[in-house]
Amino acid sequence: MPQLDTTTWFITILSMLITLFILFQTKLLNYTYPLNALPISPNVTNHLTPWKMKWTKTYLPLSLPLQ
């Protein structure tokens, strides 16, 4: 059974990594970053819902008294 020839693996993997690095660098070079990095405060609105207007009690089946 012949052995697997791995002599070219190092140069193949190295060239692949260099190519990926160059591709990612060119992608990031074209990205425009925002100039002002100030946080934007969200507009919080309070919605009135019917279940907030009254007090309700939830009865669980296990908390009912024994019959």
UniProtKB/Swiss-Prot annotation:
Its main location: mitochondrion. It holds the Pfam family ATP-synt_8. It comes from the Eukaryota. The modification N6-succinyllysine is found at K54. GO terms for biological process: proton motive force-driven ATP synthesis. It is a single-pass membrane protein. The chain crosses the membrane at residues 8-24. The modification N6-acetyllysine is found at K54, K57. It is found in: Mitochondrion membrane. GO terms for molecular function: proton transmembrane transporter activity. One of its GO terms (cellular component) is proton-transporting ATP synthase complex. Keywords: Acetylation, ATP synthesis, CF(0), Hydrogen ion transport, Ion transport, Membrane, Mitochondrion, Transmembrane, Transmembrane helix, Transport. The keyword Transit peptide does not apply. Component of the ATP synthase complex composed at least of ATP5F1A/subunit alpha, ATP5F1B/subunit beta, ATP5MC1/subunit c (homooctomer), MT-ATP6/subunit a, MT-ATP8/subunit 8, ATP5ME/subunit e, ATP5MF/subunit f, ATP5MG/subunit g, ATP5MK/subunit k, ATP5MJ/subunit j, ATP5F1C/subunit gamma, ATP5F1D/subunit delta, ATP5F1E/subunit epsilon, ATP5PF/subunit F6, ATP5PB/subunit b, ATP5PD/subunit d, ATP5PO/subunit OSCP. Subunit 8, of the mitochondrial membrane ATP synthase complex (F(1)F(0) ATP synthase or Complex V) that produces ATP from ADP in the presence of a proton gradient across the membrane which is generated by electron transport complexes of the respiratory chain. ATP synthase complex consist of a soluble F(1) head domain - the catalytic core - and a membrane F(1) domain - the membrane proton channel. These two domains are linked by a central stalk rotating inside the F(1) region and a stationary peripheral stalk. Belongs to the ATPase protein 8 family. This is ATP synthase F(0) complex subunit 8.
